[in-house]
Regions:
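N-terminal catalytic cores of NTP/NDP-binding nucleotidyl/phosphoryl-transfer enzymes
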Residues: 1-57
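Conserved acidic residues
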Residues: 3, 33, 67, 98-99
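N-terminal cationic-hydrophobic initiation segments that often serve targeting/anchoring roles
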Residues: 26-30, 62, 92-93, 174
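A glycine-rich helix N-cap at a beta->alpha junction
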Residues: 58-73
Length: 399
C-alpha cells in the first residue's frame, strides 16, 4: 500500500474547513490516497458533549471524503491537548499503514511549529516552567514564556488553538518515534468569532449558532448538512450541554472525595475544590466557576467535571489506546481495513460485541466508552432516542 493519510479530528460538527483539509492534503499526496481519521466520540476535548453523536459525525466524514473513521476512546477524548494528541497520533501509528499526518494550523508552515515542539520536549523546560509559575501567571502563559526563552517570538504560536494542537501532534510523533510524515494546511476563514468571511466558519462558532437554533447548512458540505438535518428531525440532536446538566450534577454529588482526587489534572487541590463546588453549587456553571483557579483554564475544569461523571481516572489516559474501534467505512475503507488487519499492533474492532472480549484495561476502557454513550443520549431531544445500551448494538456505517 502506498501513501495513507492520517487525520485527527473531532468533527464537532463536520464543516467545510474539514472537507478542505482532506481535499488539500490529497492535492499534495495524490487524489486517490486513502484517508483514515481518528475522531473523538460522544464527548470532546473541551469537556462537553458533541452536538451530534459519534455515529452521525463519522458517517458525515466518510460521505465527505474520508475512507475510515476510528473512535478515540473516552480517556483520550477528554484529555488535555497533550494527552489528546498523544492518544490519537499513537493510535494512527499503531495501525501500521499510515504514512502521513495532516493537520490544519493558523501558522500554515511546518518549520516554526517543529521548532516550538522541540522546545517543549527540552528536558530542562520543566525547570523554567516552574520558575514562571512561581510568578503567579496562568499555566498557558507560563509555558509560553518558558518556550520563548528557547525560540523567541515563535512562542507566540501557542496563542492560537490549532497551532497548539499542531505542536502537540508533532511532539507525539517525536516522543513516540513514529514514522509519520507531518503536513500542515493553513486554516482560512476560521476565526473564532462571527465575522469570518466565505463559507468556512470555526466549529466553535457553528456550535454557538446551532445552540441558538440557527441554520448552519451554508457552512457544511451538502452530505453533512443532510445527515445533521436527519438527526435533528429524528430527535437525536443537537445534544447541548444544558440538556445533560441534571444528569451530570446528580452523578457529581454522589461521588466520594477520593474519586475527585484521582481525576486527570487534579493537582494543587483542584480535586478538593471541585468536590466542594459539586456539593454546594446549584448549577453546572456554578460548579465550574467555583472550582476554577487563576492558574488553570476553564476547559481543564470542564474536562475534570466530565471525567468525574463518566468514571475516567488519571490511570487511564497514559500511553496510547489499546484498540481501534471502527465507526464508519468509506469508499476505500474495506481495502484499508484489510491492510490494517495484517499490520496493526492493536485489536481492530468492527463489531461492538468483540469489545466484551478485550482483555484487561482495553476491555474496561471499551466498556467505559460505551457507558458514556448511555449518558450522552439522555441529552437527545426525543425521549425515544434515550434508550440505554445503544453503543453495544451499533455497527459501523458502510458507504
Amino acid at each position: 500500500m502506498g501513501n495513507v493519510i492520517g487525520i485527527v479530528a473531532e468533527y464537532n460538527p463536520f464543516h467545510n474547513g474539514h472537507a478542505r483539509l482532506i481535499e488539500q492534503t490529497r492535492a499534495q499526496l495524490g487524489a486517490v490516497c486513502p484517508v483514515v481519521c481518528v475522531m473523538s466520540g460522544d464527548f470532546v476535548q473541551r469537556g462537553s458533549p458533541a452536538v451530534y453523536s459519534k455515529f452521525a459525525r463519522a458517517e458525515a466524514a466518510v460521505r465527505c471524503g474520508a475512507d475510515l473513521v476510528l473512535e478515540l476512546p473516552l480517556p483520550w477524548s477528554l484529555s488535555s491537548a497533550e494527552g489528546f494528541a498523544r492518544g490519537a497520533v499513537g493510535l494512527l501509528g499503531s495501525l501500521g499503514v499510515v504514512t502521513h499526518l495532516s493537520f490544519g494550523s493558523e501558522c500554515g508552515e511546518l518549520d516554526p511549529l517543529q521548532r516550538v515542539a522541540e522546545a517543549l520536549l527540552d528536558p530542562l523546560l520543566g525547570e523554567d516552567l516552574r520558575a514562571e509559575l512561581r510568578s503567579g501567571i496562568p499555566f498557558a502563559a507560563a509555558r509560553q514564556q518558558a518556550v520563548a526563552r528557547r525560540v523567541g517570538a515563535l512562542a507566540e504560536l501557542l496563542q492560537a488553538p490549532n497551532n497548539i494542537l499542531a505542536v502537540e501532534y508533532l511532539k507525539a510523533i517525536y516522543d513516540q518515534r513514529l514514522e509519520l510524515h507531518p503536513l500542515t494546511v493553513l486554516r482560512t476563514g476560521a476565526q473564532h468569532d462571527r465575522f469570518a468571511e466565505g463559507n468556512i466558519r470555526s466549529a466553535s462558532e457553528l456550535r454557538m449558532r446551532i445552540g441558538a437554533g440557527e441554520d448552519v447548512s451554508a457552512f457544511l458540505p451538502r452530505a453533512a448538512a443532510e445527515i445533521f438535518a436527519r438527526e435533528k428531525t429524528r430527535g437525536r440532536g443537537p445534544v447541548l450541554p444544558e440538556a445533560l446538566e441534571s444528569a451530570l450534577l446528580s452523578r457529581l454529588r454522589m461521588l466520594p472525595q477520593t474519586v475527585y482526587n484521582a481525576l486527570p489534572g487534579a493537582t494543587e487541590g483542584l480535586g478538593n475544590s471541585l468536590y466542594r463546588a459539586a456539593h454546594e453549587e446549584p448549577t453546572l456553571d456554578g460548579v465550574l466557576a467555583a472550582a476554577k483557579s487563576k492558574r488553570y483554564a476553564l476547559a481543564r475544569i470542564r474536562r475534570m467535571t466530565m471525567c468525574a461523571a463518566l468514571g475516567v481516572t488519571t490511570s487511564m489516559d497514559g500511553g496510547t489506546p489499546p484498540y481501534a474501534r471502527v465507526l464508519a467505512i468509506g469508499a476505500q475503507g474495506r481495502e484499508l481495513l484489510r491492510a490494517i488487519d495484517m499490520r496493526a499492533s492493536v485489536p481492530v474492532i468492527t463489531k461492538p460485541a468483540a469489545g466484551r472480549s478485550l482483555p484487561g484495561p482495553a476491555g474496561e476502557i471499551f466498556a467505559l466508552t460505551a457507558d458514556a454513550h448511555d449518558l450522552y443520549v439522555l441529552g437527545c431531544p426525543a425521549r425515544e432516542e434515550r434508550r440505554c445500551g445503544g453503543d453495544w448494538r451499533a455497527s459501523p456505517f458502510v458507504l
